């Protein structure tokens, strides 16, 4: 799926006929990937990378989780904890998964695109989605790990970090 299409979806712009067809085709391809992964007993990790397409990707991931994360976890969403809203979103995702009867696949990472995100926010005139400092990122990352560990009955956790202290806490 084109990046520009994800941006249009994120901003709730109306899609034309060709864009709708492109979206449907991308959804079919993603579904095929998840289907084959489930048959081969492997996981699929999905990551938006940029905040300005994150909601679009989150929606697609939820569709796939609802379909494939019933018996076991196939699909994981990536939660970039350098964003100040991701701990709350993780908790909301857990509640959503519970309400819809699927297991949440959560890959936790700190994130690596701080400068890019801050620069874009400044250029576009919106508040930065990034934590104010590394300590805040570490705090939310560790809180997210703890939250997942406390809810393993309905969360499959992948801890993506090189941080020794976070590994020891997990």
Describe each region flagged by the PLM.
Residues 1-170:
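Positively charged, amphipathic and often flexible ligand-engagement surfaces
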């Amino acid at each position: 799926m084109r990046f520009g299409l994800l941006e249009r979806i994120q901003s709730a712009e109306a899609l034309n006929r060709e864009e709708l067809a492109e979206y449907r085709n991308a959804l079919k391809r993603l579904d095929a990937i998840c289907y084959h992964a489930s048959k081969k007993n492997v996981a699929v990790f999905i990551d938006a990378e940029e905040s300005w397409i994150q909601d679009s990707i989150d929606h697609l991931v939820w569709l796939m989780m609802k379909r494939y994360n019933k018996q076991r976890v196939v699909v994981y969403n990536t939660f970039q904890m350098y964003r100040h809203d991701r701990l709350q979103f993780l908790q909301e995702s857990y509640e959503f998964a519970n309400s819809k009867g699927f297991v949440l696949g959560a890959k936790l990472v700190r994130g690596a695109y701080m400068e890019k995100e801050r620069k874009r926010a400044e250029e576009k005139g919106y508040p930065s989605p990034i934590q104010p400092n590394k300590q805040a990122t570490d705090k939310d990352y560790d809180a997210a790990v703890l939250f997942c560990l406390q809810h393993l009955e309905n969360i499959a956790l992948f801890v993506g970090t090189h941080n020794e202290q976070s590994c020891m806490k997990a």
